[in-house]
Amino acid sequence: MSDVVGEVAREDSEGRGRYFIRLAPEAEAELTYRWSGEHVMTINHTYVPRAFEGRGIAGKLVDTVIADARSEGFKIRPFCSYVSAQFSRHPEWGDLLA
């Protein structure tokens, strides 16, 4: 299902951040978030360039967030429709919902 090029990286800045995959010199997929309190990540947007859609890239971003939430102990509030749909498909993630 996935022929993702590159690894997921994370950038944090004051109160917000993003997960991203560099797909080409000038193309990135990203999932953006902000912190709502100390232990709640509010995911507000997921983007994959049209030329790279259908390769499992957005799913890889979400899987990385889920792994980080489990290892770092934070909850997720999915405002992004894609991430919200993924939570509906994965009831085993329910314990991570804020």
What positions do the PLM features span?
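Conserved acetyl-CoA-binding loop-helix of GNAT-fold acetyltransferases
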Residues: 54-65
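A short, internal acetyl-CoA/4′-phosphopantetheine-binding micro-motif in the GNAT/acyltransferase core
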Residues: 46-53
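C-terminal structural segments of small proteins and small subunits
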Residues: 64-98
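N-terminal first-folded block
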Residues: 2-40
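Basic, gly/Ser/Thr/Pro-rich low-complexity segments located predominantly at protein N termini
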Residues: 20, 59-61, 85
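Intrinsic-disorder/low-complexity peptide segments enriched for small residues
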Residues: 29, 59, 94-95
